[in-house]
Amino acid sequence: MHEMKLNPTVFKCPMKILTILIAMLLVSCGTRNPAPVAELLDRIGGEGTSGRIETQIESDLAEEGKEVFEIGSRKGKPFIQGSSMSALTAGIGWYLNHYVHVNLSWNNLTTDLSGVHLPVPAVKERRTCSADYRYYLNYCTYSYSMAFWTRERWEKEIDWMALHGINLPLALVGTDVVWKNMLEEIGYSRAEIDRFIAGPGFQAWWLMYNLEGWGGPNPDWWYKRQEELCSFILRRMRELGMEPVLPGYCGLLPSDAADKLGVKATDQGYWCSGFTRPSFLVPTDEKFDDLAEIYYRQQEKVMGKSRYYSMDPFHEGGSTGGIDLKGAYNAIYSQMRRHSPDSRWVIQSWQENPRKEALEAVPQGGYLVLDLFSDGSPKWMDGYDGHDFLWCMLHNFGGRVGMHGRLDATMKGYSEALRKYPGNMKGIGATPEGIETNPILYDALFELPWMTEDECADWIGRYSEARYGTESDVMKQAWELLASSVLACPTSQQGVSEPVVCARPSLDVRSVSAWSTCGIYHDVAKVRKAAADMLEEKDRLAGHPNYRYDLTDVVRQALTDSSYFLLNDVADSWKRGDKENFRKGYE
């Protein structure tokens, strides 16, 4: 026999071809069972969950640039694919809700799936997302709800975001560290820094340029803690396909900056008649570029870079006198782009913002406008001069407990905006001042972009089954009653109708806290009936955590509604001198 010898020169070309073919095969197969997703599954469902579900990122699934997920089967297991990481995790959330009938929300962020049947779909389901962006959070959320959260709580929240397909969350943790480092670099003493940086419960309004120093000073251990927490939060967000929105630099400086630094910084007066606002460094000042460079450099050390930066000069007031507004907005935008060339300015549409000069100063594609209160006081009707915008639900003003919302208006409003401005209505957002209440609204909002309009009509029935793990006409009816009453606020009322029992004792209670009302806008009989309906299912559902939470919430709402009318009755009896009825009322 003759020994066969391979000619390296001849074999060289086929080897290259083989290598290319293997590479193409790997690309076509996508990324199977990505580690961040496997870890997510084990966190939310218990160890071993990732071994029971096949997952894959397959970019070729995308449909005309829109994200897609598919739910099918492979190797006898559920198989969930997404065109992106966030599409994949949204698909997992959809599978849990609508196949496994397990609904994870703030009252129940994890579960044990070890003994739960995971259905293997016989037919593949495909969903295309109409929203390029799914935004989440409000500056206020960081103070009303998140000020003292631990790493463990943040981990669960980011998992919740992933399951809801959120790909653009506001990220503020660590910004106080950035400012401390920046101010030290430009010559501020620790005492001066302490007078400027607000405490954790008030940093939302500090970062929106409404106040300075309130609730501080912060100890050294706090800054160390926040820097470590910031690193974890941003790393986990990015692992799960989210692009954090970081706070950019638009001229914020301590109120003494004009004297301290010798810059042209305008006095911004007071916010809410009592809080000293930070000064505004006029962006045409010769030192603006240098200070912006220092800010972004210090921020990159702590938070990294982003393609999205949030800035809202003159938020809820401030003085624009003597400022070339178009020049100022253009300078702010230019510095952001110098630091991150492909970045976009995320700006809140709230009260006077964004001003006409702002829309004129920045080119198309430069802004991403958050129509902050679309569900109650929309401003998107004129289309923001062609700038891209997001339809947002602003919920839970003041971080108060109670049932309130606009479920039907949310479902219809998003579709209406998409029809009117298909070119620049780019997505959806939840911009709550506080969270951890009314989970139905957030489940509806973030499923909206993955549904057709026709599917909205019977969504409550599907939600009820997902929420409690079983079909129940009684629970479905209860939610329909709530959706047509307390979750159907007909006005722009900012938040819940506060319970009179929480107010200072008086026969004429109109509000409990600032910017609120105790007035009731809904049919309280429907809420009472919903509570009674839910109680009917106690024997069957008492062991379910979502049922226990919802029953408590709805009964509480029914009782606080009753207290409003009871107080009015007592007050009327007092005014009439009807002692007997008065005594019955307060007893």
Region spans (language model):
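Sec-dependent N-terminal signal peptides
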Residues: 17-27
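Contiguous, structured surface segment used for ligand recognition
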Residues: 29-131
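Second-shell loop/turn segments in exported
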Residues: 77-82, 142-147, 220
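Catalytic-core regions of glycoside hydrolase
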Residues: 103, 107-118, 137-141, 162, ...
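Histidine-centered catalytic/metal-binding microenvironments
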Residues: 514-587
